Amino acid sequence: KYEYIYSICGISPNDIPQSEQELWKSIDEIIQIVKEKNSKKLVAIGEIGLDYYWNKENSDLQKQAFIKQIELANEMKLPIVIHSRDASVDTIDIIRNHRVKKVGIFHCCQLNQELVRQALELGYYISFAGPITFKNSKNAPDVVKMVPLDRILIETDSPYLSPEPNRGKRNDCRNVKYVAQKIADIKEISLEEVAKKTYENAMRIFEI
C-alpha cells in the first residue's frame, strides 16, 4: 500500500516457544509466510538471534531457531537482522560457523567494542539506537567512532529505548533524528551527512 514501507520477517529470540515441537511449528509458519510473501517488499529475515538477558534457560532453542532462520535467509538470498543481548560469543560463533551468505545488520547494537569489532570483520553493518544518547552510556563515543560511516544504520527500536531528551517516554520513528545527531556529534560531521550516508547504507543492504 505504501511505497516507502518495507518488511522483515522472523522469530525474535524473545518470542521463542517453550517446547521444541512448538518451535518447529513456528519455524514452519515463518518459512511459509516468507516463501508466499517473497517480493521486493520483504527485504530481510529478522530480527533473529540470541538473548540471554531475559532468558538463558532456553538457549538451546534460541540457537536452533537462529540457525534455521539463517538457513532460510540463505535460501531466499536475504540478509539477516541480528538481535544479540548478553550473548555475543555464541552469536559470533553461529554466524561464523553457519556461513551467512549475505552480510546483515546487528540491530540496536549493544555498546560492546569486541562484539562490534568482530561484526565489522565479518562484514556486518551496525545499527545504533537510543542507548547511544543515554548519559550513562560512557563507551558510546568509542564504539561509534570505531564504526566507519558507510557501515552505520540508525533506528529507534520503537516503542522502547527512547533517546534523550525523551528517555522514559514511548518511542516512535520521529526520534531517530536524535540518534543521527548523536552520531554526527561524536564523529564531528554534519547531521545531513549522517542522514545521507545511513540512507544510502540502508538502500544498499536491503537492495531497495
For each predicted feature, which ranges?
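Mid-domain alpha/beta scaffold segments of enzyme catalytic cores
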Residues: 1-208
